[in-house]
Amino acid sequence: MTKSELVAQLASRFPQLVLKDADFAVKTMLDAMSDALSKGHRIEIRGFGSFGLNRRPARVGRNPKSGEKVQVPEKHVPHFKPGKELRERVDGRAGEPLKNDEPEDGQ
């Protein structure tokens, strides 16, 4: 699901929300989450999961073009850990085939 699909789904689920307001709400929420993570905070949404940062230590890498060794600095990367309810909900679909986003044979 893309951000625009999420906005459209919110607008259709809640008729009092116009598309513009749903878009504003989604953008505002994502901006707030991005700001919190960039400040090193952890985000916990009960029943859904938590977002945090993982530290990747500095290491020696290799330039694939020249083969030369390069120092790769330490960095922090976003990490998502699904909550128990989300894991159980997804696991309930364990026997079902994965849904393809593209229709097969023009269906």
From Swiss-Prot:
Q: Does the keyword Phosphoprotein apply?
A: no
Q: Which GO terms describe its cellular component?
A: chromosome; cytosol
**Could you tell me the superkingdom of the organism this chain comes from?**
Bacteria
Its GO biological process annotations read:
DNA recombination; regulation of DNA-templated transcription; regulation of translation
| Keywords of the record | DNA recombination, DNA-binding, Transcription, Transcription regulation, Translation regulation
Q: Which GO terms describe its molecular function?
A: DNA binding; structural constituent of chromatin
Bias class Basic and acidic residues marks the residues at 65-101
**Region Disordered: which residues?**
54-107
InterPro entries xrefs? Hist_DNA-bd, IHF-like_DNA-bd_dom_sf, IHF_beta
Instruction: Report the SMART domains cross-referenced here.
Output: BHL
Q: Which Pfam families match?
A: Bac_DNA_binding
The record's listing under PANTHER family reads: DNA-BINDING PROTEIN HU (PTHR33175), INTEGRATION HOST FACTOR SUBUNIT BETA (PTHR33175:SF5)
List, alphabetically, the HAMAP family matched. Answer: IHF_beta
| Role noted for this protein | This protein is one of the two subunits of integration host factor, a specific DNA-binding protein that functions in genetic recombination as well as in transcriptional and translational control.
Tell me its family: Belongs to the bacterial histone-like protein family.
Q: What is said about its interaction partners and assembly? A: Heterodimer of an alpha and a beta chain.
The name of this protein is Integration host factor subunit beta
What organism is this sequence from?
Burkholderia thailandensis (strain ATCC 700388 / DSM 13276 / CCUG 48851 / CIP 106301 / E264)
Lineage from the top down?
Answer: Bacteria, Pseudomonadati, Pseudomonadota, Betaproteobacteria, Burkholderiales
